[in-house]
């Protein structure tokens, strides 16, 4: 594999409905793996790749990122697209290596991972059964560089954001939603009284949404 990653595999025999889960800046491949047993009773296979770039997160501490921090300037779109190419290769390797139900492959991204998820899903919407973006936004500079497929109009999309988010203000998510609706994505947008995080309430909503849009059968979270 070209990217370090962790995996949660349900009991039983596959192929399994699968979530490709992309972490935020400063985190690692373990960060979101704990969501797997909490989503629809652990029925999803979850694959969590690690961003290819090391980034300092404190004295003597290192995390990982998908692209460099812009320090208030526009995002480095070239770096985003470079990491997207790595993810495209990673997905192909995963499809060849793990018991993935290709018709039930969902994409989930948190924060910087959400930016990467937009880049992947808007370009290759037919590859994914659903897109969930948490505490993130779609940079205009990135959107301008994407060749957005008309197939996005059939991609169920969930966006969750905290009204108290100090890192990515909710207005950035709202602006992204407006632009995504112009692309005619079938989109659900939910705001929560939370910061830059996932809460029990937002997790319950995410689980129910994945059940409806991907599993199509009753499951418990």
Which residues does each predicted region cover?
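Short beta-strand/loop motif that positions the catalytic acidic residue
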Residues: 158-161, 165
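C-terminal catalytic histidine-bearing segment of alpha/beta-hydrolase fold enzymes
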Residues: 170-221
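Primarily recognizes the serine-hydrolase "nucleophile elbow" in alpha/beta-hydrolase
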Residues: 103-152
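Short, proline-enriched alpha-helix->beta-strand connector loops that line the catalytic pocket
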Residues: 152-157, 183-185
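Short, conserved loop/helix-junction motifs that constitute active-site signature segments
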Residues: 38-41, 148-154
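Conserved alpha/beta-hydrolase "nucleophile elbow" surrounding the catalytic nucleophile
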Residues: 23-25, 108-110, 162
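Serine-hydrolase catalytic machinery in alpha/beta-hydrolase-like enzymes
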Residues: 1-100
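Alpha/beta-hydrolase-fold catalytic nucleophile elbow
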Residues: 50, 108, 134-135, 160, ...
């Amino acid at each position: 594999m070209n990217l370090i990653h962790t995996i949660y595999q349900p009991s039983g025999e596959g192929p399994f409905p699968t979530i490709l889960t992309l972490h935020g800046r400063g985190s690692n491949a373990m960060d979101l793996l704990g969501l797997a047993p909490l989503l629809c009773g652990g029925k999803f296979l979850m694959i969590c790749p690690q961003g290819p770039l090391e980034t300092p997160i404190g004295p003597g501490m290192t995390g990982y990122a998908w692209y460099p921090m812009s320090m208030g300037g526009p995002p480095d779109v070239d770096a985003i697209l470079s990491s997207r190419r790595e993810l495209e290769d990673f997905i192909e390797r995963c499809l060849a290596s793990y018991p993935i139900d290709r018709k039930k492959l969902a994409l989930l991204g948190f924060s910087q991972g959400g930016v990467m998820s937009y880049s992947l899903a808007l370009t290759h919407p037919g590859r994914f059964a659903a897109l969930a973006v948490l505490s993130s936004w779609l940079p205009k500079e990135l959107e301008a560089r994407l060749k957005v497929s008309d197939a996005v109009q059939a991609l169920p999309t969930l966006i969750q954001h905290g009204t108290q988010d100090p890192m990515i203000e909710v207005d950035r998510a709202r602006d992204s939603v407006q632009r995504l609706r112009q692309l005619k994505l079938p989109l659900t947008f939910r705001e929560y009284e939370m910061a830059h995080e996932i809460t029990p309430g937002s997790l319950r909503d995410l689980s129910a949404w994945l059940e409806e849009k991907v599993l199509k059968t009753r499951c418990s979270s």
